[in-house]
């Protein structure tokens, strides 16, 4: 019988009295559950991405809300068919989001609901800012959004300076969004520090917008940091037309792969035809490389893990094991 799973996205900014104790309690709880996750906890809060068998996911949500430090956490839920993380990862991370500079998160932009966000988009009065990385917005974004060509969140402080130079901060209203909302908590605070007076952030991010409003003013798919890689923002509208193209032949494609060449591992967009002919590689050069991991259409575009070693590495390890087992 097919089991139902949940994918959960959630975060909480606020004081955590003993993050290491919380980490230990999480790990202990998960030993009895069919789950996988990537959860970071620090003195400033929690940032969680989680997948689990539905009863276990519901048990975890109830348990976390009973924890004194996390009583107000909000979960965004997607229905999935299997766990989407390779393992259970719960660890301490001082920066829940790697911005690279400190900001006063007690002063943030105004949180607006998906319904309010949709109305403001129709007014077409604000600068709509995507605060995700370029490979994320390449496959999906809001109509008429400003799309910074940035590869990591650490580049955004410098972009904030540029934004303040290109637009009059005191008279330019800004609406910002990210996947689940946590990056906006920091970036809205940063823009306020730069002098912007009217800053709005989409409460719950694109995930919450999709759950409440459907596709609405969104184009394409949503990049997610798990085995799914890309999802429609609303389960009721799965057949979304791609807005991006295959990097090899230029036909429409919104499917990301990691290059099968171990020494490259580049994240790239590719169509089914090209990914098959290139043996899972991002270029002809990589397809001829000596250390290529085995690609198969059956595994789809799931990211390669440590277990997906190329034959050359496997052979080397086997030889070393055989050598170690030789009598002296």
From Swiss-Prot:
Claim: tRNA processing is one of the keywords in the record: yes
Catalytic activity, reaction form: uridine(34) in tRNA + AH2 + O2 = 5-hydroxyuridine(34) in tRNA + A + H2O
Pfam families: Rhodanese (PF00581), Rhodanese_C (PF12368), UPF0176_N (PF17773)
Keywords, ordered alphabetically: Oxidoreductase, tRNA processing
Active site: 178
GO biological process: tRNA modification
EC number annotated for this UniProt entry: 1.14.-.-
This protein's name: tRNA uridine(34) hydroxylase
Organism the protein comes from: Chlamydia muridarum (strain MoPn / Nigg)
